[in-house]
Amino acid sequence: MFDLIKKVPQKCLDLMERITSSGGQVFLVGGCVRDLLLKQSSKDWDLVTNLPYSELYNLFPDGHYHGKSFSVFTVDGIEIATFRGKGSQSTSLEDDLRHRDFTINAMAIDINGELWDFFGGQKDLQNRVVRFVANPYDRVQEDYCRMLRGCRFVGYLSGQLEEESAKAIVHFSDAIQVVAKERLRIELLKMMALSDLESAVLCMQRSNLLKWILPSLNECQNRIVSAYVTNKDLFIHSLDTARAIGQHKPLLRLAALLHECTPFTASENRPDERHKHVETVRELLTGMRFSHDELYYVIETIEKLDFSLYGLSTIVDLRRFLSKLGMPLEDFLDVYHAHLLASDATEAEFMAYDRMVLDLRAIRQENSAFSLKDLKINGGVLKKMGMKPGPVFSDILDACLEKVLQEPSKNEEHYLMHYARKLYHQHRA
């Protein structure tokens, strides 16, 4: 195991050496140990020690405390905690590890590179098993968010929950409602960034968590959409769509999971239902404390999936579409392609998509206007022309944009001023 310690950042080893030299015990713990064993890079390096915080402060006067549930001492970005047990500090590494969430996260490495594994974490890691440490019912009750974390780690390992751990989550699944919504948001976005998103989502489904975390997705189970070639249910369709998107776009994956009630093939004649679904998603994400920009992005994605490729038959149609697209073009292309894959689209549909991609990218390269801010005139120009401000300004500028979308060369100040004056006089007539 000595090779493991060679992968630890030098600044972390220096802290461990200083604590050891002062007579203290110190260990690397948690996710960084798990990542070392998996031969993966780690972002966070956490230490535990038997030294009280007063001694840590004497050793590292530049450090500072933080943390709500218990104090954590941070030095140069490295977190150092004192051994903690049930409800208080402890003098035992084993007791500290006993109250961590999963066996795969309850291992430690000392400065000599020796692995301390009291609960079989290494074996579980090798077998891709997610198991609560010791009594699963106790671990869950210490922090109900651990249930969602358990499903995330199932996806992280492409593994499975240990049987008793799975039973504990099902038993307490309703309690996920008391977890702070901000924490659920963080866990959900981490889950969306997994390479094996499917295993994590299916774990939520089997554990009765999905109905509380993503209720609209849960309700899509066994709902068949006859317009799909394979007649798959909306739950599987949504999951397949999300899986087909790169893991580096977690928010786009989330939008794909939540688009299920508004695919154009199923709902083009049900505008009321589409609107209701969008509002349900808005309410869900607002409750989870998603930011305004995140919320807008997800809603925009859902709404933009609700159209037919065949509705964009001309270059002007494509320009209009780009003018109303409130998300990066490449993200839209990614999610729409994923949607087609999940729908088992026909060869003709994929050919139409490929043509649309080429046309949209070519149009995007045009030195043209796609929004009001791109026009060579604005409300200030209209005022200088002697026009009286009012709702008519919006109508005039919208008409100017439509003119430019049809003829990009018309985005010229002199022409647009002349065109705007004509529209203004027509309005007053």
Question: Where are the regions that the model predicts?
Answer:
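Catalytic cores of the polymerase beta-like nucleotidyltransferase superfamily
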Residues: 1-429
